Design a protein with these regions (language model features):
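Extracellular jelly-roll beta-sandwich "head" domains, especially the C-terminal globular C1q domain
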Residues: 190, 201, 219-230
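Short, structured interface segments
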Residues: 97-117
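Surface-exposed loop/turn motifs at beta-strand-loop junctions within extracellular Ig-like
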Residues: 55-57, 106-108, 173-175, 220-222
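Extracellular Ig-like/FN3 beta-sandwich strand-entry sites
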Residues: 46-48, 97-99, 164-166, 211-213
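Short, exposed beta-strand-loop hairpins at the edges of beta-sheets
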Residues: 101-106, 206-225
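Tandem-repeat/low-complexity and Cys-motif detector
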Residues: 80, 89-94, 203-207
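Bacterial Sec-dependent N-terminal signal peptides
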Residues: 1-12
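Aromatic-rich carbohydrate-binding modules that target alpha-glucans
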Residues: 12-48, 54-79, 116-163, 174-197
Length: 231
């Protein structure tokens, strides 16, 4: 039987689960959004949770246990160790909320968590827009009346020759380039071919495979984007 801390590369985690009193129904699976990123977006109750490699505890279950005692699940990046000890420290949830978002990064052995607040504004800007890379001139998206995390925009995106990165663009939480932004996971991702968003991090940009009128919908909480080429 394996005890103590272990190390496994990220690709060997077939599944990761949240289990414990803080988790609705006792267990919720994390979504694998990339090889090095597992995510949960949803409700957490006051209590504790563990990040486990199986839904139910068994002989092969391992836990991503915080290195610090009483570690709050809301943090900017706390280290964990892999262990088979079911009595190892758990992550603490001290406030109940429907908009928790947790990211587990196996390669960094870190867990980040937050209660996501809706942004006040969201913009489209970049070389593929009519205003280019100018701050103060970005295209404002429209917030959904019923869901403050949902944003839509419809307009022309096309390659503008003669400027830097003529077919690239980004989504910004203000009419300037910092601090808030939503990025694709990889540089030059076709907006029509990937629905994943990443909040903050490296300055990767979206690109176009075709000029035209686009309808774009962003879910800030779930970190997803859907783009349709209207014409």
């Amino acid at each position: 039987m394996l005890l103590g801390s272990l190390t496994l590369p990220a690709q060997e985690y077939k599944e990761l689960w949240l289990v414990g009193t803080a988790v609705p129904g006792g267990a919720q699976q994390l979504q694998k959004v990339s090889d090095g990123d597992y995510k949960y977006a949803g409700t957490l109750q006051v209590g504790e949770l563990r990040v486990a490699t199986t839904r139910k505890a068994g002989k092969l279950t391992q836990y991503l246990a915080p290195m610090l005692p009483d570690a709050n699940v809301v943090n900017r990046g706390l280290a964990w160790k892999l262990t088979a000890d079911a009595s190892s420290p758990a992550w603490q949830v001290v406030v109940a909320d429907d908009h928790y978002r947790l990211h587990v990064y196996p390669s960094q052995q870190q867990l980040c968590g937050e209660i996501v607040q809706p942004w006040g504004e969201l913009f489209v800007g970049g070389g593929a827009t009519a205003s280019g890379w100018k701050e103060g001139k970005m295209q404002l998206m429209k917030r959904d009346i019923d869901n403050p995390y949902l944003w839509t925009w419809e307009g022309e995106l096309k390659r503008h020759e003669g400027i830097e990165e003529p077919a690239s663009f980004k989504f910004q939480g203000q009419d300037r380039w910092y601090p808030k932004a939503l990025h694709p996971y990889a540089q030059d991702t076709d907006i029509l071919k990937d629905t994943r968003l990443r909040t903050g991090g490296p300055d990767t940009k979206w690109t176009l495979s075709a000029d035209g009128i686009y309808r774009i919908t962003i879910d800030q909480f779930n970190e997803t984007v859907k783009a349709v080429l209207v014409k």
